[in-house]
Amino acid sequence: MGGNALSQLQSVRVDGVIDYPNDAWRFVADRRRPNELRLAAYRGDSLISAEGFTGTTAWSSTPGSAVCALSSRQGSSIQRDAEFFSPLLSGAPDGATLELVGSTRVDDAEAYDIHVTRGDGFQSDYLVDATSYLLLRKREVRAPRAGEAPIPIETAYYDYRPVAGVLYPFVTVEREQADGKLISVTVLKRVEPNSVDAAAMAPGCAAKS
């Protein structure tokens, strides 16, 4: 993965499945640089909801309803999810600060622990492989799902594959940091580079399958 590949990647369409212990749904996520997101959720072939970030405003919608603009507090997690690259690659956006805390072991790998504090005060720890520089873990305090209380969560990244010369993790596992209890497993089925135009990012519940 090089800087040239990163600069040429302008958008991605991701098709995947999120499995929870008692639930599962398919999603299609459209992303465009620098920070636009449209995420549609499905049960089977039925669209159940959509949400996203236009670059300035977070929004949500369900089939048959009007688009709802979210407050900065309500939409903060969506806005973070909309970042095309992590703060480690995007040059500390929006006043974020990065601090090298030290190093630790992740499985059998030596990893750098980089603490990120965003402009809004939200904090995360990124554990990066000291040899490959791939992201291995992310730790932060947030809600597992909408409407739930924030807890310490560790996200693990696996199965990196090249997408237009950029390595993407195709498997993501979230666990409670306190006891390792499984929260969710996300598996990407398809990642299409540079396939999303501006029209695809329109807020609302038009299906994008």
Regions found by a protein language model. Name each.
Residues 208-209:
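Short, solvent-exposed mixed-charge patches
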Residues 23, 63-65, 86-91, 120-124:
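Short acidic/polar alpha-helix capping motifs at helix-coil junctions
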Residues 77-115, 135-137:
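Short, conserved active-site entrance elements at the starts or edges of catalytic domains
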Residues 3-66, 97-100:
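N-terminal mature ectodomain segment of secretory-pathway/periplasmic proteins
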Residues 59-86:
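Acidic/charged, solvent-exposed loop-and-adjacent secondary-structure segments enriched in E/D, K/R, S/T
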Residues 28-31, 49-55, 68-76, 128, ...:
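Short amphipathic beta-strand/extended segments with alternating polar/hydrophobic composition
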Residues 44-47, 107-205:
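Gly/Pro-enriched, hydrophobic low-complexity segments
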